[in-house]
UniProtKB/Swiss-Prot annotation:
GO cellular component: nucleolus
Disordered: region residues: 38-61
Annotated positions binding ATP: G268, N269, K270, N271, S272, G273, K274, S275
Principal EC category: transferase
Source organism: Debaryomyces hansenii (strain ATCC 36239 / CBS 767 / BCRC 21394 / JCM 1990 / NBRC 0083 / IGC 2968) (Yeast)
GO biological process, one term: rRNA processing
Name the UniProt record assigns to this protein: Polynucleotide 5'-hydroxyl-kinase GRC3
Transmembrane region(s): none
Superkingdom: Eukaryota
Amino acid sequence: MSAYAALQKMSGASSILYGINGESDNDESGTIGYLRNSSDEEVEAEEAEVPTTSTMAPTPNIIRTPSIVPKINSFICESNFIPNDDNFIVFHDHIIIGLKANEYILINGQSKMTIQRGAILINTGHYMFAHPNNCIPIIASQSQSLPIISSTQVVDRSGIKDSKTDENMHLFSSNYKSIIKLENLYTGLEKIGTYHPPFKRLFYSHAVIEDEDLTEYERLFKTYSFEIILRDRGCIGISIEKLWLNQIQLLISDIHEDLIPKTIMIIGNKNSGKSTLSKTLLNSLILANQNTVSYLDLDPGQSEFSMPYCLSLTNHSKPIIGMNVPKVSGDEDSVSHYYGFTTPQSQPSQYVSIIKALFREYDQVYRPRGHHLIINTPGWIKGYGKELLNELTAFINPNQLILLSNNTDNDNMDNSDNLSGLTFQNSRCFQGIYQTSKYSPFQLRMYNKLSYFHQVDTLKFDFNSHILLRSPLKLSYETVNSSKDFKGINMVSVLNYDTGLNFELNDLLSMIDTSIMGLYLIDHEYYSSLKASLKKSEDCDYLPQYLNSTDYVNLINYSSSNNIFMGLCMVHSINTKDEFFNIYLPGHNQHRLTEMITKRDYKMLLVKGDGDIPSPDLLMFDMLLKQQEDLKRLNKKRKKNPNVDDKDVLKIPYVTFENKNKIGGIWKTRRNVMRRSHQR
């Protein structure tokens, strides 16, 4: 698919205003519009000629895999399970399902699953058996393919503990292979659609379902946090192809030949199935080893394992069914660092430095514990993206490098070009599965931001009230006139901006106001040694102290204990008269931050890269609707009396509801626009 076709199909740069149904208008003009920092931004960089390095890599072992192309169009779009009074038992907060041989269900929404009898296959590939203590959360959203739960034959009875109760006793017969229990799981994510209308179908919510469109059994799910897809409604299930399963089984067998933890890196073009394969491998290794697996996510654009604008190393001991929900900040079993951008090309040297630090953390802490490592990479394998891969593979030297491609023959010219110059011990080619999400990269990044700032605890989110209805945290900032024992925000920095070179210091507030910033704590002794390099202005003594981007790069040592990354904060506004920031940050992080500053005497640094606040958090949607309704009423009155004033109309700065003329007016803000005739 071309970049233009992808943009046409996946256009998701929704306006701050929406129609009555919460849907954004489509742009049907004949121009190519590129949204900055979308995952399609690297297209030009990929096409550019970049000299390859002359470093000779050791001759790797290339493992040939079958070149059979799986049938990627045979999607499963509905359950073949047919509910009745015998196999479908309904309770107020859970249901029990009996599956016969070869039956499966597609699950949409959020639930907790317990296997009560026998065994099941998840996504047609992951074998799990009954045990009362194995309660698995399922977070299934419309941004991804839905999980499939199918019955299967028990392989080994050892370890299986069936749960026979009065509720399911009649299902313990030869007619049924598997019994599962699905319980309600309300995390708060189901309410994100009321907070941001374009996400009203992202998670299952009975509030958006019309009764007249439902069958008798579908109507039962209106009291649950999940549903079973009983007929084709445009959903697609995750059905792992048999060829993938065979290749994964061979890979795991090779890994188990010795007891040394292995590193597996996955590369491929955009939308080729890297994240799906990474998660499939993660689940396969966890279930095969019953041991924790480490996961290094190198995609800063739309990762479900990292905070927005960050890169992370996380550890997982349970399989992930559906969407991964990151743990709250401060989790001791994960390491994150602020990168600041959504594409590696914005700060490539910083990008590589963070990845090397995260890999060292794995090498020194988690590899000795026996953790295997899975590395998921961005879809940028041409041009300068290839140069980054050259450097990263030379440093990591993965045991297994998996290339997702249209052709699984290693001798294929494109595959040979993609693998040339990379350092690895063994390589495999997997058939790519090319499927586009219903939601654009822009929308997925917005979801990541909203879920981060509205997360209350692990698997708990608050979208009941607007974030602006909460009082912001007031943090004083240090100026040239502050005392030596000042506690608060000691310095700020903007990546790629040095004073006198890229901007003037008196423009600083306009650069950081109303933005998302990374928050680092710096050891106070280390801070004292660099205080002389901070930029101050005697003429603007109300400004916070500024750290140049070049000094920031030298300051933050990602492998050092002198600095601690505390997550993200949202700068709502800056009061220059009283010298404080109004900020929002997740509630679970606020107490930890206060304790670190007051009791342990850390100094605080706020740093910004790309940091747009999501529009739903910037303005209250209800206020916009009220202004729109006020204007409608005013226009009706003015038709009868043109002299009616607008004193009763709610006024919001920088927002207008007046229609623009198509000719001579301004419809939309556009960036990097080229007409078709301008293409070369």
